[in-house]
Amino acid sequence: MDIALSSDALDVSFHPDEGVHQIAVGLISGKVQLFDYGAMFHNQSTQPDESRTSGKAYRRVWSVRPSHKSCRGVAFDASGSNLFCIFKDKSIIALDPSDGHVKARWPRAHESAPSRILPIHEGLMATGDDDGIVRLWDPRCPPEGDAEAKPLRSYDHHSDWITDMLWCTHLDPPRSKKKDQEDDLKRKRDEERARSRLIVTSGDGTLSVIDIHGGKKGVEVSEDQEDELLSIASIKNGKKLVVGTQLGVLSLWAPDRGLLDHADRFPGHPSSVDALCTLDQDTVLTGSSDGLIRVVQLFPHKLLGIVGDHGGMPIECMKRKGHLIASIGHGNECKLTDLAPLLEEGDVETDAAEPEPAVMLVSDEAHLIARSADGSDESAGESDVMQPPPATKRRTAKSKAGKKSVHDVDQHASFFADL
């Protein structure tokens, strides 16, 4: 199902409550829109007149424009009581999900436009910007009036835009090279003690691990991967990290082996991997700049097929809630895809009494799945795994999108006009 938007979308976020079927979208026009897709889960005859007469399985709850600059990120907090948004004018704004009114504002939160926002818990929120600065905030303490926003802490170890952030409630400590008893005891104590960490990927080709309790010294930065790191997800209950790159290679990281360098690599995508979502503990969904959403199995590595297609337009963002995946590309629509056929019963916490939603099923995309994972026809005899193309350095899709490799750039140049 496609949700029609008033302009091109840059980010999307599901309401965290399982009983609330709402999704927020940040637009290039500066608008933030909230949609209710609950009609997909109920008989159409029980729906309000608006959704029944329109023939749509969704309705727009509200639309606001807190800034005239593009909204580059949206994210609900864990309780769903706040919708945090970042804008090109360098501000952070908290909206009330009930009606969209502004609850709090952090003006001039960054020196350059923020590119990512991640609410961690009610007392902590992280943002990253186009210059590679990561900042931590207390959402409960916005500045008064038009006062300049002051972060709890600021990190400047990255030199290029922040592409993605992942919060790990526990990250395994690296294994000691010395197998003596003292090291084993120390590692055991570390494993028993919560090691929450913020994992950050950047366009400068490095991955960093931030201990928010460790001050400036609580930062570890990987070696230069000689490729832009664009997205990140965790599998194996946090034992492995998957990172998408500009060259289309998935780099695999093992925290217990240290995060100074990747532990494995899996080529196979003909274009950059701009978005990642965990499907289960062995499988991820990848959103690529060729417009395809692929299912990728890891350990052993295998491209399983395609579950979505944005018509050749790059996929900017993917978010998952239960058996639904929301994806946005370079267009004025948000696609909702039903993943229920891919998920075994009991893998996803959903209401058993609810019928299957009337969204695009994987079976409806049989003509896509029949193609190999790189988008070619299987009858051609080509392997699912392709070698990555020659390295080409791209600039950020948010602030430096001018050099990003997409199809028919000239025809879609207006997408980047207000970024």
From Swiss-Prot:
Keywords: Nucleus, Repeat, WD repeat. GO terms for cellular component: nucleolus. WD repeats lie at residues 4-45, 66-105, 108-147, 180-220, 224-263, 268-308, 351-390. The keyword Cytoplasm does not apply. The keyword Repeat applies. Its main location: nucleus. Disulfide bonds: none annotated. SUPFAM superfamilies: WD40 repeat-like. Coiled coil: none annotated. Residues 172-192, 372-408 are annotated as: Disordered. It is found in: Nucleus, Nucleolus. Residues 392-404 have a biased composition (Basic residues). Belongs to the WD repeat WDR55 family. This is WD repeat-containing protein JIP5. It comes from Malassezia globosa (strain ATCC MYA-4612 / CBS 7966). The lineage of its organism: Eukaryota, Fungi, Dikarya, Basidiomycota, Ustilaginomycotina.
